[in-house]
Amino acid sequence: MNTDALTTLIESSDLDGLVRFVDGLVTSRDWGGIEEMKDRCREAVERGKQVWGPAEYAEYRLALDAPADRAAAVLGDGKGRYGPGPLWEVAASRHSWCEMESLVSIPTLRAMIGHERAIRGDTVDPDSIDSHIVEIPPVLQPWEPIYPVAVYRADGVDFPEGDRVPLEWVDLPEAGRQVDDEGPADALLALVRPWWDESSGHADAVQVEGDALAAIRSIGPHRARITDVTLGEALAAMAWTGSSGGAYGSRRGTPVGRSLAWWVLATLLGYDEMPDDPSDLEEAAELRWVLWDPGDAVGGWALHLAVEDPQDGVAWAISAVDMA
């Protein structure tokens, strides 16, 4: 590593130059050099230099590209909060559970990485992580979908939504009579809480007497584009939503999104807490699940979902948007 060049870049607060410097060290696989550069930038920040961004970028590239031991060394609670995603998720996107298990001792990080790797196909022993942090098993159930996961790159990240079936226009019936919600509407809103807590989005959720279309009408539109979907497709959409921070909030990660989606199922089925047997939640496949949108230019981050319980004659709908 060229320490003289690094000194010049830091003292001149050349942010673009420091990012290119990190990229060069990654190309040469000089992990020790990246760690030194990160530490020197942190020291310079204490002297008033505005080089915290390149320091965070160095940590990001270590989590993304370095061997597992180097990646694990930069992890910590809250790390990556202001980046494209939490550093534990960045590291877990590139390193297997076998590589990471013995290197991560902080219970929160261990649980999140274990769940992320289980979602990505690794076998994770539930007894190897704290079950109180993510209160669902790190084992995909037969009724669950293949969840869309974040794809981290040197220059950014993609959050694929997965395949969505086409939507068709329908005229909506009269709005259903709104009734007091006993939990599901709050669980649906929890999927998107960072969109208004930390960002500039908004969301509405209702419970009504009637079917899914009556619930959608209660949100506001007279017409909507809709499609009926399977439980798996609805779970994938909810987990994708719950993992995000919206346009400007902090990303929570797919394990959080999956757990929040399970909680929606539990509340819809009348549970006050998560059932001991995960297979009990498969009963939610008997509900009618509808993805919809109001047909205008939604853009940004959006979730439009309706759920109908035909046996009890009630339905729920959520409309959430956070414009990028």
Predicted regions and their residues:
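Extended aliphatic helical segments
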Residues: 19-22, 26, 45, 51, ...
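C-terminal, beta-strand-rich globular interaction domains
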Residues: 217-324
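Short, low-complexity intrinsically disordered segments
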Residues: 29, 50, 86, 95, ...
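Extended, low-hydrophobicity segments enriched in charged/polar residues
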Residues: 56-256
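Charged, amphipathic alpha-helical stretches
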Residues: 1-65
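Generic detector of well-ordered alpha-helical segments enriched in charged/polar residues
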Residues: 7, 19-23, 35-38, 42, ...
